[in-house]
């Protein structure tokens, strides 16, 4: 499980609910760097103290995208629902902007993560740091050279920049750049067990799912989430059996087009 900085429940409460379960999976904290480094460091310290096992640093979303569906639907968070882990964070004081300046380019982007920020984060925590939002092989190579514990190929489900490359397109390029030096996970568009198998065939070490779990939660609470995960697992097992894979290690690129490796220029 990966808990977001923006979660509406405290990171400590989630850890207390998850960690005692003997059948649980990993518990990671998805971190958004805040303009106030002291506040960011306090978040990291809270995650460590609560028992989180890794930090997932989002590197590609210094601002929210243009979410037309939400606007058309008139979506608003219900009263009382908000990012409780950011309570007490003071917003940066806006400075006066000239006619040729932008609140985005002369404000928010000054706080976007840099390679130096990643090195700083690694220096203040004992937890492994994974980078989420990597789509370009050059960035993947740089991240590994800086000691990233893993990469997550992600385009935020197309909600941040709707014309960003699909994760299925970016994944094999990133895997090639990493050359096995770190695990490469992927999210975005995982809806069926067959999608999981395709991701593994493209080189993913694991997949992450977001919206399907939320759909299950909205329909049937915790039982709905468990049902969604069970469906994905059952579909994956059937897909593996029908493609002759007895283990996930046997899911290679050959499953997708009959060749062991992508053709030159295919990715």
Summary of predicted features, one role per range:
Residues 1-37, 41-48, 232, 251-267:
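N-terminal capping/small domains of soluble enzymes
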Residues 1-3, 129, 142, 227:
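Contiguous N-terminal and early-domain "leader" segments and peripheral loops that mark the onset or edge
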Residues 12-17, 21-24, 34-186, 194-215:
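Alpha/beta enzyme core
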């Amino acid at each position: 499980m990966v808990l977001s900085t923006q979660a509406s429940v405290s990171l400590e409460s989630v850890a207390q609910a998850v960690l005692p379960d003997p059948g649980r999976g990993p518990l990671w904290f998805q971190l958004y760097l805040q303009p106030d480094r002291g506040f960011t460091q306090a978040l990291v310290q809270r995650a460590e103290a609560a028992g989180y096992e890794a930090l997932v640093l989002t590197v590609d979303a210094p601002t929210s995208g243009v979410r037309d569906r939400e606007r058309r639907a008139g979506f608003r968070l219900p009263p009382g629902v908000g990012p409780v882990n950011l309570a007490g964070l003071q917003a940066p004081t806006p400075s006066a902007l000239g006619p040729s300046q932008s609140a985005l380019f002369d404000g928010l982007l000054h706080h976007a993560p840099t390679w130096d920020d990643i090195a700083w984060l690694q220096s203040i925590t004992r937890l492994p740091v994974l980078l989420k939002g990597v789509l370009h092989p050059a960035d993947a190579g740089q991240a590994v050279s800086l000691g990233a514990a893993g990469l997550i190929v992600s385009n935020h489900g197309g909600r941040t920049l709707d014309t960003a490359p699909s994760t299925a397109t970016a994944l094999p390029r990133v895997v090639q750049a990493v050359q096995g030096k770190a695990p490469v996970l992927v999210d975005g568009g995982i809806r069926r067990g067959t999608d999981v198998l395709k991701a593994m065939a493209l080189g993913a070490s694991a997949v992450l799912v977001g919206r399907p779990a939320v759909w299950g939660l909205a329909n049937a609470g915790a039982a709905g989430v468990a049902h969604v995960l069970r469906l994905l697992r059952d579909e994956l097992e059937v897909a593996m059996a029908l493609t002759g894979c007895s283990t996930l290690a046997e899911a290679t690129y050959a499953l997708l087009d009959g060749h062991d490796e992508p053709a030159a220029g295919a990715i």
